[in-house]
Amino acid sequence: EGSLYGSAPGGALGVASAETRYFRISGYGRINNYLAVLAAFSGVLTSVTEAEDRLLDDFSDLTAQSWLVGLGAKGIFLKKDGASLTVSQPLKVTDGSASLDVPHGLGADGRVLRYQERIGLAPSGSETSLELTYRIKWSKSLELGAYGAMRYEAGHNPQLGLRSELATVVRGTF
């Protein structure tokens, strides 16, 4: 309650309630015993049912989508290792608008003067992410991994250009 698409609930940008419909189509196919191809597409339709007295109000229906295509492999260097290479677009609002409540001054009686402006909620950028992962089961209780990503327009922000990330993972069980 009080948030859209996993954002923080409450506050000036929160909503009182919303209804979201979601679908996902995904597929997986083995090329051989060591290599597989995968793909997924998700679509989202959200109707904000209540958002009064907020900075954003009077929402249209919001649509969003995400997609992914990739390859997964096992037994690359050793029997107990695996890797994946994917290209994806994280969830992105593709259409929708809302009225923005803009304060612009104080009246003689101390009241805040405001006007409403209709704004589009779809970002101007479109993140595309290229990700590479590698993991190896080192022992019964230890797994090691590495993750690398190149993100273009991260967060669907066209000003961010190309970003890279690298992480290592050590996972143990006791």
Enumerate the predicted regions with their spans.
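Outer-membrane beta-barrel "beta-signal"
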Residues: 82, 136, 161-174
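Outer membrane beta-barrel transmembrane domains
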Residues: 1-17, 22-28, 38-158
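Mobile, glycine-rich extracellular loop/lid and propeptide segments
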Residues: 34-36
